[in-house]
């Protein structure tokens, strides 16, 4: 809470001093039904989308927890490391959201196309760096978060296996976030919501059925765990197909409905 409040305070002071036109005056505090409608139109589908995605994550976490305490410890190790790896991709998508929104409002559609192209190039550049870091450190990540004497072979296996499967697929997350930003910036929030449903279905189906299909005699085997690890990349792939395909159609085929 303190960190978030400090961040808000510093940011507010900065833009208040740097950008006078962003200073809120009493005359600005009034309701505009068109703006309210747009906020609900964009915000509600995205809110529901994140709720749906968290449901899928809960299902995956429940299945991983069934593998025992070592698997649970591995989750606490690889999740923050995964977050570190994806920071560049997340930052680019956030910047792209603002860029698309501004240029869509100004009807500078060619700049949006250029921004998409440049972001993909930057995603690929960061991806290769992430790939090297993720694969080379996969088996060493537990030592970062837990004492060396507690990092047994099972924890290292669960953590390294997940990262070795996930890291090569992080380019999908970059494309997913880029597509989501483009769709949000062009006020098409319903498509990310639908992709979230597809992602949820894909993740749940893999978590529920793949372990038993791989090893029906022992659905908690190492091979079954590997199958569960693929649930995240498959969910990303489903979202990329839905949202990426929509971006191609809207931006390049329909030219923003022009």
Across the structure, where does each feature detected by a protein language model lie?
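Helix-terminus/linker motif at the lipid-water interface of multi-pass membrane proteins
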Residues: 51-80, 84, 102-103, 142-151, ...
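Hydrophobic faces of transmembrane alpha-helices in multi-pass small-molecule transporters and flippases
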Residues: 9-13, 28-59, 63, 84-88, ...
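Membrane-helix interface segments
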Residues: 70-71, 189-190, 224-225
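Small-residue-rich hydrophobic transmembrane alpha-helices
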Residues: 74-138, 173-195
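Short alpha-helical transmembrane segments in multi-pass integral membrane proteins
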Residues: 1-43, 100-169, 212-258
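Hydrophobic/aromatic residues in alpha-helical transmembrane segments
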Residues: 11, 56, 60, 96, ...
């Amino acid at each position: 809470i303190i960190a978030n409040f400090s961040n808000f305070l510093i940011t507010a002071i900065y833009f208040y001093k740097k950008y006078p036109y962003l200073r809120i005056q009493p005359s600005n505090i009034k309701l505009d039904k068109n703006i309210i409608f747009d906020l609900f139109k964009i915000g509600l589908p995205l809110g529901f989308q994140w709720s749906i995605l968290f449901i899928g994550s809960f299902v995956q976490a429940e299945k991983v927890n069934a593998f025992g305490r070592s698997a649970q410890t591995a989750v606490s190790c690889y999740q923050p490391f995964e977050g570190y790896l994806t920071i560049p991709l997340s930052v680019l998508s956030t910047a792209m959201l603002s860029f698309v929104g501004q240029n869509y409002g100004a009807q500078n559609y060619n700049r949006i196309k250029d921004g998409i192209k440049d972001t993909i190039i930057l995603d690929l550049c960061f991806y290769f760096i992430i790939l090297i870091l993720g694969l080379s450190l996969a088996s060493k990540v537990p030592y970062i978060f837990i004492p060396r004497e507690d990092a047994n072979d099972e924890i290292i296996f669960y953590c390294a296996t997940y990262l070795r499967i996930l890291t090569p697929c992080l380019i999908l997350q970059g494309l997913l976030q880029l597509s989501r930003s483009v769709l949000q910036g062009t006020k098409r929030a319903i498509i990310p919501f639908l992709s979230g449903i597809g992602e949820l279905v894909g993740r749940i189906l893999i978590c529920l059925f793949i372990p038993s299909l791989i090893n029906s005699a022992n659905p908690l085997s190492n091979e079954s765990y590997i199958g569960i690890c693929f649930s995240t990349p498959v969910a990303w792939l489903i979202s990329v197909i839905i949202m990426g395909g929509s971006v191609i159609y809207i931006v390049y085929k329909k030219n923003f409905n022009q």
